[in-house]
Amino acid sequence: MNPAELFTLQATDDRMHWTWQPSSLLLTPAKTLQGGAGLGAATAAMVAVTGRPVVWATAQYLSFASGTAEIELDVTVEVAGHNTTQARCVVSRQGQEILTTHAALGSRSIDRDGVWCTCPDVPPPDSCPEYRFFERRTGHIGDLIDLRLARGRQLDELHGTRGDGAFAVWVRVGRGVHRMTVPELAFIGDLMPLGFADAMGEPVAGNSLDNTIRVGRLVDTEWVLLTTQVQQVVNGFGYGRGELWAEDATLLGDVSQNAVMRLHTHIRALGTPNTASIRPGSGVR
């Protein structure tokens, strides 16, 4: 499957209103829509309305979206300038808001650019072991993506010793080299909470409260290297950021988010999000 097909929207009579039928492959093990996928669909809607590329987008998650029923996306253009548009998109299902997204879109012609951060020196995907997190043959996200551990430890290697907060995993969505898109990067970027386990030294994961993506240069690649840096865990919430690199070390973008910390074993046993204790969320479960 071409990853772009996962974010194909359906137009309606209202150019500001779109619908989307999410694939089951975009669902977490709890059978809820992965937050980055929701952000990705919202950016696709705003690009379709404005005709401009995404520079920055952020999402605030309001409720879980279980299953694959049709989702509605309503775009509002707040400001449309010569080079930049500021827009927002409300993603909902049957009248219940799932997430709200704000974005800046546009481009400018300038002959000066550069990258001042460095892609870490890690082995290529084929030389890295599979990262054992999602179960396969379950009909959800685990059947869509391949994960290869480039830096850090497997969950069963964690014995309470905390890491330095740095973690890296190669991610492949579908097979074959293809041009990266913002929706796909938003989806991959929402895997940032994978880094919390290595940092904490125990098998924890996180439900995203929010997601932010800043877009760099989009190039062709099969694998994306997600490098994460956990910044802090306090009061049951974790804060972290990440960078998205192509196989040729092109910086595709960077991400950041806050997440509700949960034990991975508890999440597996529960099977569904504990909405009685925490309503917002998406992300990795």
Question: Each PLM stretch: what is its role?
Answer:
Residues 1-285:
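Terminal targeting signals and extreme-terminal segments of soluble enzymes
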